[in-house]
Amino acid sequence: MTQASAIIHCKATLLEPAMPAGASWLFLVLPMAASYRLPTRSMVSVTGTVAGHPLQATLQPDGRGGHWLTIERALQQAAGVCAGQTVALALTPVAEEPEPLVPDDLHVALAAHPAARATWDDITAVARRDWIFWVVSGKKAQTRGKRIATACAMLASGKRRACCFDRSGKYSHALAAPTPKAG
């Protein structure tokens, strides 16, 4: 585990995802030695640099105890990097997790449930991020709708944490880095 102020230096290769076809983003998988220095096996927000350009992002769990990172087109262009290149990273876990972006459908549901909204407003940013992650990780629209309803009911009852899901993907094998496009 690392202290919030410790800078993690490493290198990783930029990969093009196999799906969706024609994706504008790339990704990289952190070396395990770098991931092990992070404070958690699940999502963790960091600041730092990629190829010398500033970055603020949330690393995603790769389901193997490590992490992966999306590199959006704007950062690719600013850094002058492309798929296949190895880039230097300098990452520092943030001292306080940023507020997550609430999906529109969840936002509407919370607005319609004052008791759920009251609990939502009282929980930490990490807890809100976990609820959002649980809701959006459903593969089907029907599952997502059920999870929104369940989340609102649980929040309204005072439940502060989404439970019963593996935040790292290591045990459930439900999370993974994208599959790289074949060369």
For every predicted segment, state its role.
Residues 70, 88-90:
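Conserved beta-strand segments that form the floor/walls of ligand-binding pockets within enzyme
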Residues 84-86:
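Loop/turn positions that initiate beta-strands
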Residues 90-122, 130-133, 141-152, 156-183:
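Surface-exposed, charge/polar-rich loops and edge strands
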